Amino acid sequence: MQKPGKNVILIPGMLGAGCTSVATKLAEALGLRVVNSEVIIRRIVVEKGTSFLELAKIVSDGEVEFEKLIRNEALDFIEEGEVVVEGRTALMLLDQPVTLKVFLHAEKDFRAKRVAERRQIDIEEALREVERSDEDRRRLVEKLYGKSWLDLGLYDVVINTSRIPVEVAAKIIETYLQVNRK
């Protein structure tokens, strides 16, 4: 559970909807840290004194459940507070009492174009990645909470980034937080 008075913002969303970009802009504006699977894996590697390859072997051998490992570390980050948790990692924390939960979505073609540009892959491959990611996220939320990840009742704010640029999305969230300070 987060410490009282400490901001913890979750920004889960669809692959290619701009979760990382929005989280980064928001964190810069508010002086918060961005947390995602990459940050968590780096922390695990440092804390355990292991390598990425050794960690991958432990996970692939079934010695440890990857999602449980990521979730436990993410819980430590939200306990510390002053973080924006983004992407798939944020989906693992939807059951936690946090400051704000913002879901980012966008049209599939828009997301595929972003993924193709970012990863320098063709649009067909990007579409497949978007579809795989949607299915992975669907299964994850269903497994953890027995709900659809597209159930808007899970989130406080929902933003369509195919219509609202990431800079504006970050500003909307920042403004919401300022207006709703207790």
Describe the role of every protein-language-model region.
Residues 4-9:
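Pre-Walker A (Motif I) flank of P-loop NTPase domains
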Residues 11-26:
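Glycine-rich phosphate-binding P-loop
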Residues 23, 34, 44:
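Glycine-rich phosphate-binding loops of nucleotide-dependent enzymes
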Residues 28-35:
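Post-Walker A helix-loop "phosphate-sensing" segment adjacent to the P-loop in P-loop NTPases
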Residues 37-85, 89, 109, 121-122:
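ATP-dependent small-molecule kinase phosphotransfer cores
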Residues 64-65, 123-169:
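Small-molecule kinase domains that catalyze NTP-dependent phosphoryl transfer to phosphate-bearing small molecules
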Residues 97-119, 123-132:
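Conserved phosphate-donor/acceptor-positioning beta-strand/loop module used by diverse small-molecule
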